[in-house]
């Protein structure tokens, strides 16, 4: 793979208990960080097509992963990225002999079927863990279960997953623990039959989304989660749902769909956070779900700054993202690093190793 994605620089620090002295700072790295196997597989597949260099255009259906450094790299090599909000435009712009690349998150089933019916050169980089979610949802949809999916409603993985349930079962998306608790309250209500109406009324307030409420099955439920959610919260959501549903004598089938790589990164990040560093940098794309959850985890321990890449840091200011406000702001480097001696760096599974190394080099120079 391209040197952008290599781990060589960071391996210098790995035999030193994940701590390196960088200038005036002690930099703490987790046991596990950087690209997961699914991301590496997706990037290799796309790189292999580029290396063929046979003159055919390459169209990527949305970002390959949610990291701007990675996507910009592929754009520089001539890959055409179709905007996630307008994937159907592929049919207007791509010739039939073009390479059409399905990203790691997957795409909605109807769109995939149309693309496979029109194009011959399709490169599917969908993560195998995501496909496991699809298999579970497809099976439970055939059983007419009410599908509960714990995840970010607008995320492409979630949209691809719920499309596997087709239109013959009710699908409910819960974005967070508060939504799960509220939904549990509705399930506990004696007026359960009115849930299909209630859920639509509160969606805008609680962030809950409901599809096909006319097929709501109050006796059989199936629970899955987006593969990059916080593992600890996923367990809590299952506990909340199971307690309520089984108390009523109904059925809940649950599938642990948080991928192992995500779980390991969260576990390693938690171990670093418990050391209570003076400061924590979270590094990754602003749209990255697994990076966002590392941010949420780290907030409980130390001051946290969410950085897109190494360009976010210079001698005068640090650009960082506030997820709660969906806003990038600037802070004085001098003020942020005042009285700081230890800095933990946590990176999402879609963050290149070289970006982490560049941040360490930036800190050395400050």
Predicted regions and their residues:
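The feature marks the mature, well-folded catalytic cores of soluble enzymes
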Residues: 1-366
């Amino acid at each position: 793979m391209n040197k952008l994605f290599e781990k060589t620089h960071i391996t210098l620090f790995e035999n030193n208990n994940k701590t390196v002295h960088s200038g005036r700072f002690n930099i703490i790295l987790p046991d596990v960080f950087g690209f997961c196997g699914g991301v590496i597989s997706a990037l290799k597949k796309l790189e292999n097509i580029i290396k063929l260099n046979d003159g055919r255009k390459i169209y990527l259906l949305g970002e390959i992963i949610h990291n701007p450094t990675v996507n910009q790299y592929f754009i520089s090599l001539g890959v055409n990225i179709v905007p996630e909000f307008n994937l159907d435009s592929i049919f207007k712009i791509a010739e039939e002999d073009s390479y059409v690349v399905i990203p790691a998150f997957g795409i909605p089933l109807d769109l995939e079927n149309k693309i496979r019916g029109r194009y011959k050169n399709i490169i599917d980089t969908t993560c195998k863990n995501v496909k496991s979610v699809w298999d579970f949802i497809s099976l439970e949809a055939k059983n007419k279960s009410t599908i509960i999916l714990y995840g970010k409603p607008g995320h492409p993985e979630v949209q691809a997953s719920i499309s596997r349930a087709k239109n013959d079962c009710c699908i409910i998306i819960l974005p967070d623990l508060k939504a799960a608790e509220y939904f549990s309250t509705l399930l506990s209500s004696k007026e359960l039959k009115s849930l299909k109406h209630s859920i639509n009324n509160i969606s805008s307030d609680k962030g809950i989304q409901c599809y096909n409420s006319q097929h709501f099955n109050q006796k059989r439920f199936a629970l899955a989660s987006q593969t990059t959610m916080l593992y600890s919260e996923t367990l809590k959501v299952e506990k909340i749902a199971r307690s309520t549903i089984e108390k009523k004598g109904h059925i809940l089938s649950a599938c642990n769909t948080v991928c192992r790589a995500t779980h390991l990164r969260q576990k390693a990040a938690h171990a670093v956070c418990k050391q209570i560093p003076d400061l924590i940098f979270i590094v990754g794309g602003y749209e990255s779900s697994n990076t966002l959850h590392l941010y949420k985890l780290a907030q409980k321990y130390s001051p946290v700054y969410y950085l897109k890449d190494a360009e976010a840091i210079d001698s005068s200011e640090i650009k960082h993202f506030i997820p709660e406000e969906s806003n990038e702001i600037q802070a004085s480097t001098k003020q942020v690093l005042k009285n700081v001696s230890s800095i933990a760096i946590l990176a999402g599974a879609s963050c290149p190793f070289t970006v982490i190394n560049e941040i360490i080099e930036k800190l050395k120079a400050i």
